[in-house]
């Protein structure tokens, strides 16, 4: 890599199933990985020898299911007892354990049992994306804009930001995926002049968002947003997997539910079939020796696939109705409906959406897999002063808080301070008071959600305002000040007005969050793992080099023409050096140095023998 630090910021779409990275150097470029793929699987695998990330991890998933981790985005910022975590846990082959209420992955790595938080797994994927960018740019990358689903709550946003910190990135901004996609769309040819309402329909591998934007002369104003942080292509695959699992059981009497390897192989076949069914109406599924030596061969039609997922497909229209209602915009006033996310390639999803908008032509001008990273790279260029084009120079993003924020009041009633769809950054205030005479302390539990009953919303954290002067109930004036920054992350302050006493909480230290010490520890661990990966790669390279050199010398020694030209005694010396080199190769844990020494030793003997011919 060339010296120096990249002055801009890369844009990373950290996806549930696949991630994508883009950079802006005079224009946006989506960067392909070492396999030439423009999207990289969000998979991390652990083996007795090494750690694999991306394509290499996904490719060996069937052989090593218990130690191949994916879907970290479905865990990040969630509690272990979260309903969706418990449901997903039944389908994941890797082990999930409860550590102080937080979900943690347990794997076997380098011969030891190791545990990793979802933030650490996500940071490994982010590190991979950073390395892909560095290989292309030729400079060290330090800054990034990372995207999250618009419907991510405060905990999920902060945890994603923490993952960026663990990977050694300075996360300049967390931006919403549909908003990033809207930038990619808005910067398309000749689109930036006219004022219009654009609905972004973003259905990915694991999450679903709908955002309604008003775009006018470079100003992107999000009017409303809705979605489901647990709906996407993975769920469609799961429904197909269940269907075929039952079919295989009927055909063979074998239940593969407990076999992680068979399930992974069948899931991969389902994912492939799902993609194929977007362009043809029928496809076959073939898995050799799926279980107990039984092959599985079957077919599925597009209609059957649609039937298996009909309720999920229908559920995607609810957030569409919600955003129109919240923004008070009738569907006839939507100028464009833009498709984002790989799952929008499904014909049924497109048809339902088009029908909802009275047969409207859907906008497919942007690549659904790459649009989010594209928009993030543009935002990165703007934030680092690297954007040079006329289009991006005046670009302004006005996003919203996806869920209401407030405090718990007496009787567990939710007192909203920041209503959902409020433009961020924002500062909102609301006054409260005491409920008992001479009450000196008031607890402020901070919640996020839309339910009247606090228990049905997400508790983000709590703090106490102490030393309130003794007064009658209802007399003190307590002001709660909610500040939401451009990342959608919250800071709350409470002030007792007569004394000016205050207490505050940045929700980053709430339940299930990482402290700065924990992040620092994870950063150091990440560097150790990276060093271990590099050491393993060097050792692997040294072994391969020695193996190929040994093979070429063996060929020369056994070739009658070449060996006849060797000086008497030289052949014996070469054969002896060859057996020493082979002995080094047979030592499983031979160090890189030992392998290099063996290669140098063999070369010395060969060179001497050849030169004295």
Curated annotation (Swiss-Prot):
Q: Which Pfam families match?
A: HSP70
Annotated stretches, region: Lid domain (SBDalpha): 516-612
A cellular-component GO term for this protein: cytoplasm
Q: Does the keyword Glycoprotein apply?
A: no
Q: Which reaction does it catalyse?
A: ATP + H2O = ADP + phosphate + H(+)
- PROSITE patterns listed in its UniProt record: HSP70_1, HSP70_2, HSP70_3
Q: Which UniProt keywords apply?
A: ATP-binding, Chaperone, Cytoplasm, Hydrolase, Nucleotide-binding, Protein biosynthesis
Motif Nuclear export signal: which ranges? 574-582
Keyword Magnesium part of the UniProt annotation: no
Q: Where is this gene product found?
A: Cytoplasm
Q: Where is this region: Inter-domain linker?
A: 392-402
Any single GO molecular-function term of the entry would be:
ATP-dependent protein folding chaperone
Physiological role: Ribosome-bound, Hsp70-type chaperone that assists in the cotranslational folding of newly synthesized proteins in the cytosol. Stimulates folding by interacting with nascent chains, binding to short, largely hydrophobic sequences exposed by unfolded proteins, thereby stabilizing longer, more slowly translated, and aggregation-prone nascent polypeptides and domains that cannot fold stably until fully synthesized. The Hsp70-protein substrate interaction depends on ATP-binding and on allosteric regulation between the NBD and the SBD.
**Assembly and binders:** Binds to ribosomes. Binds close to the ribosomal tunnel exit via contacts with both ribosomal proteins and rRNA. Directly interacts with nascent polypeptides. This interaction is dependent on the ribosome-associated complex (RAC). Interacts with SSE1. Interacts with FES1.
| Protein name per Swiss-Prot or TrEMBL | Ribosome-associated molecular chaperone SSB1
- In which organism is this protein found? Zygosaccharomyces rouxii (strain ATCC 2623 / CBS 732 / NBRC 1130 / NCYC 568 / NRRL Y-229)
């Amino acid at each position: 890599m060339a010296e120096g630090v990249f002055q801009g910021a890369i844009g990373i779409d950290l996806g549930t199933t696949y991630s994508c990275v883009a950079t802006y150097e005079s224009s946006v470029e989506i960067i392909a990985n070492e396999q030439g793929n423009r999207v990289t699987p969000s998979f991390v695998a652990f083996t007795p020898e090494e750690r694999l990330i991306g394509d290499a991890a996904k490719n060996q998933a069937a052989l090593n299911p218990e130690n191949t981790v994916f879907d970290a985005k479905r865990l990040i910022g969630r509690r272990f007892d979260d309903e969706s975590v418990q449901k997903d846990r039944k389908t994941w082959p890797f082990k999930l354990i409860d550590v102080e209420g937080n979900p943690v992955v347990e794997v076997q790595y380098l011969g030891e049992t190791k545990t990793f938080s979802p933030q650490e797994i996500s940071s490994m994927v982010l590190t991979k994306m950073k390395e892909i960018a560095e290989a292309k740019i030729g400079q060290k990358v330090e800054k990034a804009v990372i995207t999250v689903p618009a419907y991510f709550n405060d905990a999920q946003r902060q945890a994603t930001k923490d993952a960026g910190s663990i990977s050694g990135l300075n996360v300049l901004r967390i931006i919403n995926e549909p908003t990033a996609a809207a930038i990619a769309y808005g910067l398309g040819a000749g689109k930036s002049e006219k004022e219009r309402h654009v609905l972004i329909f973003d259905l990915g591998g694991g999450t679903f968002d709908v955002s309604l934007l008003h775009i006018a002369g470079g100003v992107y104003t999000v009017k409303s947003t809705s979605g489901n942080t647990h709906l996407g292509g993975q769920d469609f695959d799961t429904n197909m997997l269940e269907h075929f699992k039952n079919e295989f059981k009927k055909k063979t009497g074998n239940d593969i539910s407990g076999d992680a390897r068979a399930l992974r192989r069948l899931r991969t076949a389902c994912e492939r079939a799902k993609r194929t069914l977007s362009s043809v109406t029928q496809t076959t599924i073939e898995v050799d020796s799926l279980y107990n030596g039984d092959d599985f061969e079957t077919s599925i039609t597009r209609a059957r696939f649609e039937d298996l997922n009909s309720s999920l497909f229908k559920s995607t229209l609810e957030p569409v109705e919600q955003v129109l209602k919240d923004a008070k915009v009738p569907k006839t006033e939507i100028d464009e409906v833009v498709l984002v996310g790989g799952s929008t390639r499904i014909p049924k999803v497109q048809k339902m959406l088009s029908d909802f908008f009275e047969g409207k032509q859907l906008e497919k001008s942007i690549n659904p897999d790459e649009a989010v990273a594209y928009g993030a790279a543009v935002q990165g260029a703007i934030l680092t002063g690297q954007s040079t084009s006329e289009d991006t120079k005046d670009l302004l993003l006005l996003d919203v808080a996806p869920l209401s924020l407030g405090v718990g009041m007496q009787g567990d009633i939710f007192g909203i301070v920041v209503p959902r769809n409020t433009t961020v950054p924002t500062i909102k205030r609301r006054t409260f008071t005491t409920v008992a005479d001479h009450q000196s302390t008031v607890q402020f539990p901070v919640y996020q959600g839309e339910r009247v009953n606090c228990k049905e919303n997400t508790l983000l954290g709590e703090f106490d305002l102490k030393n309130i002067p003794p007064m009658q109930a209802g007399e003190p004036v307590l002001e709660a000040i909610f500040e939401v920054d451009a990342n959608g992350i919250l800071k709350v302050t409470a002030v007792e007005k007569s004394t000016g006493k205050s207490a505050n909480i940045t929700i980053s230290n709430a339940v299930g969050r990482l402290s700065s010490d924990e992040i620092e520890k994870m950063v150091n661990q990440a560097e150790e793992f990276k060093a271990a990966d590099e050491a393993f790669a060097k050792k692997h390279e040294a072994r391969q080099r020695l193996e190929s050199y040994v093979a070429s010398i063996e060929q020369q020694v056994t070739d009658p023409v070449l060996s006849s030209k060797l000086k008497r005694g030289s052949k014996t010396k070469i054969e002896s050096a060859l057996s020493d080199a082979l002995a080094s190769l047979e030592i499983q844990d031979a160090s890189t140095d030992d392998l290099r020494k063996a290669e140098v030793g063999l070369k010395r003997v060969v060179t001497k023998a050849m030169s004295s011919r």
